[in-house]
Amino acid sequence: YGNDVRTRAKARAAAGSDARMNGCELPVIINSGSGNQGITVSVPVITYAKELKATDEQLYRALALSNLTAIHQRTPIGRLSAYCGAVNAGAAAGAGIAYLSGGDYEAVIHTVVNALAIVSGIICDGAKASCAGKIAFAVEAGILGYNMYMQGQQFYGGDGIVKKGIEDTLKSVGRLGKDGMKGTNEEIIKIMLE
């Protein structure tokens, strides 16, 4: 896959998750109560900050943006859901990367909407090794969401669960995660207990 910053950002986040899911006991930052989400909102942003030679202040702002964006997305979903939290975290990492790359408010919000349009609906079936793959995919969606916007491409209200405006899109995703996945969660538990 190469060694460009995009690949390194995904690989490092996935490696951090893989280590945790396989027993590594080193401490990790959390987001929304999850170490994997903490890794996902932080490691790609840090990787890009180093590549772009960002100042400490730019890095801290990007990390704050990424973390708060993930929390804002997660709030309507609630604490427990079959909706994979890495999806929100990957979109949020894309927001932080957009900021580091010089993106303004419009770039940041369209990055998040684009990323959510790409990967919303991934299920959470417990903490295990495959979380690393989901994280890599979610980070890719975040980066792709930003690149799409920079190329004049975006998803619009009416494209699936995407609504007009960031807040309505987040409400839509929140509804999917909270209400739409109740039955999914029950079925996942049945499958895992077989």
Task: Give, region by region, the residue ranges found by the protein language model.
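C-terminal structural cap/anchor segments
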Residues: 78-109
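Transmembrane alpha-helix interface/packing and boundary motifs in multi-pass membrane proteins
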Residues: 26-32, 71-78
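Accessory "access/gating" subregions that flank catalytic or transport cores
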Residues: 1-36, 180-194
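Conserved phosphate/anionic-ligand binding catalytic regions in large, soluble enzymes, centered on
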Residues: 26-42, 84-89
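Alpha-helical support elements that line or immediately flank enzyme active sites
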Residues: 38-54, 94-102
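Functionally critical mobile loop/hinge segments
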Residues: 1, 8, 99-194
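Acidic-glycine-rich active-site phosphate/pyrophosphate-binding loop
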Residues: 4-23, 55-73, 112-121
